[in-house]
Amino acid sequence: MIKLGAQYFTIRDYCQTVEDFDASCKKVSEIGYKYIQLSGIGDFSADEIKPIIDKYGLKVVCTHRPPKNYLDNLENEIKFHKTLDFKICGVGSMPYFYEMEDRSEAIEEFVKNFKPVVQRLKEEGLVFAYHNHAIEFERINGKHTFDTLVEKMSSDNFKFILDVYWLAFAGIDPAKFILKNKDDIACVHFKDLKVVENTAKYAEVGVGNLVWEEIISACKEADVEFALVEQDDFWNNNNPFESLVISYDFLKKRGL
């Protein structure tokens, strides 16, 4: 059964102090979410986070942590994830990829630096997960970066946080892609794509053009454990918590 959660990047502006994080967790819990992904929040310790999420009955299931944390302070990252008692150690994008002129060189740099990280996390019973955008579906030397990463990392402990918005943005059918790559999925980001004045915008689940019946069905068939609602910004200037409510209500009506 798919477990529905909230990606805290959606409410990052309301999570920069411990007090605001506490208030936001209360609101998220009151909406009905029980699972969360930590991303974009203030630089809090696991010991600061744990009593707050416990108070509101929330369970962390995934992170987006700065890539340098894994490279410079891996043992601290292991402790952080274990203190909060979850396995999916995520990064939001590939460092260097947007900065380096030679994208193939950026991939090689990422693989070289993160292969030992992936192996060390595996030794500790943790999973490394990479979040896609559209850029992973550019063709470099005739191959999508996504496929190149899977091939070069060559580890059953290298997984993906699949973002269905960015799949659709890249011209990829999310449902078919989920089924094709089911063994490489750590969790899935649910956000919709709405066209506003000929421009793709992030939108609440069910408000845009993605075919959610197909996506949800594919996630079930692929045994996806966590679907995490995310919205990077707000096409209609909604309060982020209002957007989380809209997505939650839509998905709950569809059995999640």
Residue ranges and their predicted role:
Residues M1-I31, K82-D85, I140-L162, A168-L256:
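Histidine-acidic metal/acid-base catalytic patches
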Residues F9-I11, R65, M94, H133-I135, ...:
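Short strand-loop junctions, especially beta-strand C-caps/beta-turns
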Residues Q7-E19, H64-L71, M100-E105:
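Active-site mouth loops of central-metabolism enzymes
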